[in-house]
């Protein structure tokens, strides 16, 4: 079966990581053929979050076809003999569909406007929030294998306590969490506490113990980044409808430190008591500065069930027979 996977642009963020994983394991696990449909990087100008490295990663692995308008998608479907179109989208009806094949819509934020032959969501939270009952095709959680870290490269002592995160560039935006990072990272009383950020916009005054790194598609580098950390310091206002970065840290048995309440609560639902929670500056400050007291074993956390086999078996149930 030939399946096309569509996103309206390719970025370093979780939606396109998810799309890549589905396309990859559609071939590796289900034995189908995968192609990618998206818009041309060079025609998108300064569209938010697009990244040439993401395009190059997809181009290296899959045939990639570009559309400008909706009829172009149907032309690609007809020309390439595509039987199923899997579309990652927010969830609303915006006309993006192919009327000449079977469509699986994969909703990332809401599920209130059903369309396509299968209208699904990435986590049960979306059903709860949208007051719907659509099928759930979850994202899968995958990390590369590596035992190495970045401590020597980043001049971080082996015995230092390191908190880190990666996400969208603007997605470390809870004020009191940023203030904790700034205050501890600049306080000489805590010379052994470091903070590292991958693909996060720089904030606060410069400090040798607060390090900002560019985004990457290199899975081994991301695994080394995770291995460098004692824990993930989550800081996105609004929360997650799945939380792929939380999943990747959790697969590596790294505790996730996060705010106790968010609008989008999928990461809280999945991790439950395995998440180390706070509600204000003082609570987080105490967690970070007294880390050995708060560290916990999270080796049986809820993200570990989202293996490629588990997810692709669900995905396969919704393919046309």
Label the predicted regions.
Residues 255-259:
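Short hydrophobic beta-strand element within catalytic cores of glycosyltransferases
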Residues 279-285, 289-321:
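A charged, aromatic-enriched C-terminal amphipathic alpha-helix characteristic of glycosyltransferases
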Residues 139-208, 212, 219:
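Conserved catalytic-core segment of nucleotide-activated headgroup transferases in glycan assembly
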Residues 109-110, 117-146:
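Donor nucleotide-sugar binding/catalytic pocket of nucleotide-sugar-dependent glycosyltransferases
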Residues 82, 227-241, 254:
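Acidic donor-binding loop of glycosyltransferase active sites
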Residues 7-13, 20-72, 201:
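N-terminal strand-loop element at the rim of the active site
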Residues 223, 246-251, 265-266:
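Short alpha-helical segment that forms part of, or immediately flanks, the ligand-binding pocket
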Residues 67-73, 200-201, 210-226, 239:
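Conserved active-site histidine-acidic residue motif and adjacent donor-binding/catalytic loop
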